[in-house]
C-alpha cells in the first residue's frame, strides 16, 4: 500500500491560513505520505488573460492524471475545502474506487452560512466514503453526525499543528495583548474602547485601516516568524461586537479551531478566548489561557492574574507548543 497526500502546489503568503494547509501536507510527508499534485497556483502570471487559459488547461491535465492514479489499495490524505475547479473529478474517482481516505477539515462553509449546492452534493458523499475525518471540536463533530456522517470515523484535533523552529524569548506578565489575523474582517476592532492603564492592544496582519486610535498596529510578519509577536497574551475573538462573538464569523467560533490559537501557543502567548468558543474548555482545562464573556472583561481578568499564575501558564503552554511544532496532533490520525 502506498500513501498519498493530495495537494495544490501553492506559494506561501502572509496569511497564516495557507500555512495550516502547507504544514498539514508536510506532516503527512513525515508520516510516510508522498505528494500527489492535482493543481497548481501561479500568481505571477494569473493576471494575464492569455496565460489564464493555459493554467486552467494545466490544472485540468494534472487533475485527470491524478485521478487515473487512484487505487483502492492506497491511502489518500486530503484537506477540506479542496480548492480547484476540477476537484470533483478527483472526488468521484476516490468514491468510485472505494479508496481509503483521510480528510482533515479546515473549514465547513455551510457552518458559516456559505452554502454552495454544488459543493454539498459532493461533500457529504465524500465524507461518508472516508475512512477517517479529522474535525476541530466536539461541536463540529456533533454537527457532522446530525448531517448523517458516522460518528465512529470522526476524530477531534482540537488545535492545529504549527511547524516552526523560531525561538521564543521567555515572556513575562504584562497587560499587553496581541491580536493577529485578517484585520479587515475583524469588525469588532472598530468598537473597542481601551481606557488608560487598562491594557495595550497590539494588532498584526493585513488590511488594517487605522479604524481605532486606541490600537497599536504592528504590521505583518511571516507565519514562520512567530517571535515577531510582542506582548504577554494572545486574543481570540471575531465578529462584529465586543460584547460577544456575533455575526457570520463570530458564530463560527462555536465550532471552529482558529489557526491563531496554534499561532499563539507556539509563540508562547497565553490565550484570552471567548467563553463560548469551541476551544475555551480545552484552553482553560490545560491552564494555557483565560476565558472571557466580552472584550470589556479583559482589564478585570488581567487584574486578577499574578506573575506566578502567569508563569504557570507559560510552563503549560511550552509543553503544548512542543507538540504543535513537531506535528504530533495530526500524526496521531495518519
Locate the predicted segments by residue.
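Conserved catalytic-core segment of nucleotide-activated headgroup transferases in glycan assembly
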Residues: 162-230
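A short acidic/histidine/glycine-rich donor-binding loop in glycosyltransferase catalytic cores
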Residues: 286-292
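Nucleotide-sugar-dependent
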Residues: 226-267, 273-281
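A charged, aromatic-enriched C-terminal amphipathic alpha-helix characteristic of glycosyltransferases
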Residues: 15, 293-301, 306-334
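A short, active-site helix/loop in glycosyltransferases that binds the activated sugar's phosphate group
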Residues: 113, 129-153
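Nucleotide-sugar donor phosphate/pyrophosphate-binding loop at the beta->alpha transition
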Residues: 108-125, 163
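Carbohydrate-associated surface elements
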Residues: 139, 159-160
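N-terminal pre-catalytic "stem/leader" segment of glycosyltransferase-like enzymes
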Residues: 1-102, 111, 276-279
Amino acid at each position: 500500500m502506498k500513501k498519498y497526500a493530495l495537494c495544490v502546489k501553492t506559494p506561501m503568503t502572509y496569511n497564516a491560513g495557507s500555512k495550516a494547509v502547507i504544514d498539514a501536507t508536510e506532516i503527512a510527508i513525515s508520516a510516510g505520505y508522498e505528494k500527489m499534485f492535482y493543481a497548481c497556483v501561479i500568481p505571477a502570471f494569473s493576471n494575464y488573460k492569455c496565460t489564464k487559459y493555459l493554467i486552467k488547461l494545466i490544472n485540468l491535465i494534472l487533475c485527470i492524471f491524478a485521478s487515473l492514479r487512484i487505487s483502492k489499495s492506497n491511502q489518500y490524505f486530503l484537506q477540506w475545502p479542496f480548492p480547484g475547479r476540477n476537484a470533483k473529478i478527483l472526488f468521484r474517482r476516490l468514491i468510485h474506487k472505494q479508496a481509503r481516505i483521510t480528510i482533515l477539515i479546515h473549514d465547513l462553509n455551510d457552518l458559516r452560512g456559505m452554502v454552495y449546492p454544488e459543493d454539498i452534493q459532493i461533500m457529504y458523499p465524500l465524507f461518508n466514503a472516508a475512512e477517517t475525518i479529522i474535525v476541530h471540536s466536539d461541536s463540529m463533530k456533533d454537527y457532522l453526525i446530525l448531517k448523517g456522517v458516522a460518528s465512529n470515523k470522526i476524530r477531534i484535533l482540537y488545535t492545529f499543528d504549527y511547524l516552526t523552529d523560531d525561538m521564543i524569548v521567555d515572556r513575562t506578565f504584562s497587560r499587553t495583548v496581541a491580536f493577529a489575523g485578517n484585520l479587515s474582517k475583524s469588525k469588532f476592532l472598530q468598537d473597542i474602547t481601551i481606557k488608560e492603564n487598562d491594557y495595550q492592544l497590539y494588532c498584526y496582519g493585513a488590511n488594517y485601516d487605522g479604524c481605532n486610535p486606541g490600537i497599536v498596529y504592528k504590521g505583518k510578519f511571516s507565519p514562520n516568524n512567530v517571535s515577531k509577536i510582542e506582548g504577554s497574551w494572545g486574543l481570540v475573538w471575531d465578529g462584529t461586537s465586543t460584547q460577544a462573538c456575533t455575526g457570520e464569523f463570530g458564530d463560527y467560533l462555536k465550532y471552529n479551531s482558529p489557526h491563531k490559537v496554534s499561532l499563539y501557543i507556539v509563540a508562547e502567548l497565553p490565550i484570552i478566548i471567548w467563553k463560548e468558543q469551541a476551544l475555551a474548555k480545552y484552553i482553560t482545562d490545560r491552564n494555557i489561557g483565560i476565558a472571557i464573556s466580552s472584550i470589556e472583561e479583559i482589564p478585570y481578568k488581567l487584574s486578577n492574574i499574578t506573575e506566578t499564575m502567569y508563569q504557570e501558564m507559560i510552563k503549560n503552554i511550552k509543553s503544548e507548543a512542543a507538540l504543535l511544532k513537531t506535528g504530533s496532533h495530526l500524526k496521531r490520525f495518519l
